[in-house]
Amino acid sequence: MKLTLVQIFFMMLLLLLGLGMGLGLGLQMAAAVLEDSDQSLNDFWSSDSQEKAETTKEGDGTRTTETLLLSNKGVVQPVWPEETILAEDEVGGNKMLRADALFQSDKDYLRLDLMNRECNSLMAHKVKKRNHTCIPEYTFIHEELDTVKAVCKNPVVACDLKGAKCHKSSRPFDLTFCKLSKPGQVTPHCNYLTFIFEKFIIISCNDMKVKIT
């Protein structure tokens, strides 16, 4: 069947329109990627948090360098422009902020592979009972126990912990912060966002129980 000039014209027009839409969509996607790479942690945290750390989803990590304060209580609290209290913390595979579990084992301290730092994998071993509310947020410190303890040998620095002598790490530590993607999820169907950081830590070494503020 022979094509008329009018049909050829319309086919070319449709082809050009398709190419234009494809190019526009590609530019929008590129802009979205650039925007996501500069996204702040405040977008994923509660509205009363004003933190400005770069974030990623599903284990693809951009890094920031900030300071954490470790002390003697059982709560995690980053030192950011407006304090945000996290629920728990771990050094490697061990809970550092629960006195019962503090410094009990050196197993699985180094999990530096990004796939191993994906929060759904990290949090899987915490889902012990079905039909319970998922842990809303959790922080992991990916350092060896001896490295954390060695911070106590550093010079004393000022801190806001009453009566405590504080010591600051000489380098940032690797941290993974896990945030539940949506509230109200129930075990075992917990889905987490993954945020990877590097932060200095400050420790109150009075009794080696740890809090992050």
Swiss-Prot record:
<feature type="glycosylation site" description="N-linked (GlcNAc...) asparagine">
    <location>
        <position position="131"/>
    </location>
</feature>
<keyword id="KW-0964">Secreted</keyword>
<keyword id="KW-0130">Cell adhesion</keyword>
<dbReference type="GO" id="GO:0005576">
    <property type="term" value="C:extracellular region"/>
</dbReference>
<comment type="function">
    <text>Secreted proximal epididymal protein required for post-testicular sperm maturation and male fertility. May be involved in sperm adhesion to the egg zona pellucida. Does not have ribonuclease activity.</text>
</comment>
<protein>
    <recommendedName>
        <fullName>Inactive ribonuclease-like protein 10</fullName>
    </recommendedName>
</protein>
<dbReference type="GO" id="GO:0080154">
    <property type="term" value="P:regulation of fertilization"/>
</dbReference>
<dbReference type="GO" id="GO:1902093">
    <property type="term" value="P:positive regulation of flagellated sperm motility"/>
</dbReference>
<dbReference type="GO" id="GO:0003676">
    <property type="term" value="F:nucleic acid binding"/>
</dbReference>
<dbReference type="GO" id="GO:0022409">
    <property type="term" value="P:positive regulation of cell-cell adhesion"/>
</dbReference>
<dbReference type="GO" id="GO:0007338">
    <property type="term" value="P:single fertilization"/>
</dbReference>
<dbReference type="InterPro" id="IPR023412">
    <property type="entry name" value="RNaseA_domain"/>
</dbReference>
<feature type="signal peptide">
    <location>
        <begin position="1"/>
        <end position="24"/>
    </location>
</feature>
<dbReference type="Pfam" id="PF00074">
    <property type="entry name" value="RnaseA"/>
</dbReference>
<keyword id="KW-0278">Fertilization</keyword>
<dbReference type="InterPro" id="IPR036816">
    <property type="entry name" value="RNaseA-like_dom_sf"/>
</dbReference>
<keyword id="KW-0732">Signal</keyword>
<dbReference type="GO" id="GO:0034113">
    <property type="term" value="P:heterotypic cell-cell adhesion"/>
</dbReference>
<dbReference type="GO" id="GO:0050830">
    <property type="term" value="P:defense response to Gram-positive bacterium"/>
</dbReference>
<dbReference type="InterPro" id="IPR001427">
    <property type="entry name" value="RNaseA"/>
</dbReference>
<keyword id="KW-0325">Glycoprotein</keyword>
<comment type="similarity">
    <text>Belongs to the pancreatic ribonuclease family.</text>
</comment>
